[in-house]
């Protein structure tokens, strides 16, 4: 076991992370709770709020910095944005292929629909994530509590399960 100290901008939490030794490969395996990202200090909700505000509301760095009141620092938010942007197309292509297989009637896949009207890969990924979440909610009752604002958190968890690696 080891301790992680994730932050939400106002306080630092202390979370126990359990780890096991894989008998097959002799590497350690950790089980992170779904509100933590690998290699990030801030909670997934905090990262998600920044990325969505930047992508969909067009929030400037000065606006985000003023709202954050110093935590997270603007340079940290910029790193999240760059990381998200560098992975967005890769994740988007996987989500679109998955939707085409599982929900071919999805409005996101309509050649005259919402998917063709977005202006960038970050916005496209967030849009596709909403449709993926809607599809998943129709299949699994456990997702009933997820809403539109949770779509980035959901897609990160889904992508981790798909082996997509790091998004932010």
Residue ranges and their predicted role:
Residues 1-24, 28:
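N-terminal juxtadomain amphipathic helix
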Residues 8, 12-15, 36-41, 54, ...:
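Short, charged/polar micro-motifs that form catalytic or ligand-binding hotspots
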Residues 26, 54-58, 81:
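Generic hydrophobic/packing signal
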Residues 27-46:
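Short, Lys/Arg-enriched anionic-surface-contact patches
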Residues 43-58:
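Short, amphipathic alpha-helical "recognition" segments used to contact nucleic acids or chromatin
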Residues 77, 90-168:
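Long C-terminal interaction/binding lobes of large macromolecular proteins
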Residues 82-91:
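Short, solvent-exposed alpha-helical "recognition" segments
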């Amino acid at each position: 076991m080891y301790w992680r100290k994730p932050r939400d901008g106002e306080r630092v939490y202390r979370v126990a992370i359990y780890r096991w030794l894989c008998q097959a490969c002799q590497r350690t395996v950790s089980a992170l709770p779904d509100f933590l990202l690998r290699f990030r200090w801030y909670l997934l909700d905090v990262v998600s709020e920044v990325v969505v505000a930047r992508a969909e509301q067009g929030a400037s760095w000065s606006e985000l910095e003023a709202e954050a009141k110093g935590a997270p620092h603007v340079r940290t938010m910029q790193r999240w944005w760059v990381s998200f942007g560098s992975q967005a197309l890769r994740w988007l292509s996987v989500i679109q292929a998955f939707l085409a297989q599982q929900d071919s009637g999805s409005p996101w896949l309509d050649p005259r629909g919402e998917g063709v009207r977005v202006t960038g890969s970050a916005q496209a990924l967030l849009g596709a994530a909403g449709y993926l979440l809607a599809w998943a909610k129709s299949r699994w009752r456990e997702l009933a509590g997820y809403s539109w604002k949770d779509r980035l958190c959901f897609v990160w968890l889904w992508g981790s399960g798909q082996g997509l690696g790091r998004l932010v």
